[in-house]
Amino acid sequence: ASWYGSGFHGRRTASGETFNSGGLTAAHRYLPFGTRVRVTNLRNGRSVVVRINDRGPCSGGRVIDLSRGAAAIIGVFQSGVAPVVLEVLGR
């Protein structure tokens, strides 16, 4: 996982929403918009539930791009990237 934020804050996401970098949202390549996903950082065991509202990540090898707010909760903000496990919770 990686995160994206300040440069995209206030822009439209692929779902048509306005991106809030402090929110608990994420970008995924194919999960339907509105899907809730538990993301667990394998380095520290911390988890956050996010809602998919955008498409990505664009960088190879990454399964999800988190908002800055979600990344901060699970400890990805400082490192920039982390190995994660995704659990799809539904809509």
Show which residues each predicted segment covers.
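Secreted/periplasmic proteins
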Residues: 1-91
